[in-house]
């Protein structure tokens, strides 16, 4: 049931992204970034001895949502710079630099809200500790993916499309 729900969630996310972004390349970039972020989160969870349960799945969902938000902000900034006449690589660097502060600030703010839950005592602390750690790991992973992986994917995927359309090589 979890597997089919995850697949359905990914399909719905991709369809909604395509409807609103209206560009196949950017939809593909975000679609590739989501599993990268989730795998990075799984690694952090593994090394901190967290298991996959309903609480940690909720944390993963929140982190994936924040990744999509951050990714769209970064992609739109890169796209806007590319429309100004910059090369794809220049647009990726400039666009990411322009919004990096805002993306980092919004992600860290959400982390600061969830991380103190780790220090709760009693039953509520035991209940929500795994979720708080998972949200934190997921948000940290999504931040790195949005700042480092998204610009690289944008350069590679849209650069490949441009070269295929007669744009030449770099």
Q: Where are the regions a protein language model picked out?
A:
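Hydrophobic regular secondary-structure detector
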Residues: 1-170
């Amino acid at each position: 049931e979890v597997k089919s729900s995850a697949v359905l969630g990914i399909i719905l996310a991709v369809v909604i992204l395509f409807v609103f972004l209206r560009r196949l390349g950017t939809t593909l970039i975000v679609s590739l970034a989501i599993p990268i972020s989730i795998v990075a989160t799984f690694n952090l969870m593994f090394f901190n001895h967290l298991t996959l349960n309903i609480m940690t799945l909720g944390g993963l969902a929140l982190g994936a949502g924040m990744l999509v938000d951050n990714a769209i902000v970064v992609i739109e900034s890169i796209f806007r710079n590319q429309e100004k006449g910059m090369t794809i690589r220049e647009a990726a660097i400039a666009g990411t630099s322009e919004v990096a502060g805002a993306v980092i600030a919004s992600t860290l703010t959400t982390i600061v809200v969830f991380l103190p839950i780790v220090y709760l005592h009693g039953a509520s602390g035991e209940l929500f500790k795994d979720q708080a750690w998972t949200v934190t790991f997921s948000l940290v992973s999504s931040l790195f993916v949005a700042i480092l992986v998204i610009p690289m994917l944008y350069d590679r995927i849209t650069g490949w499309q441009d070269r295929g359309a007669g744009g030449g090589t770099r």
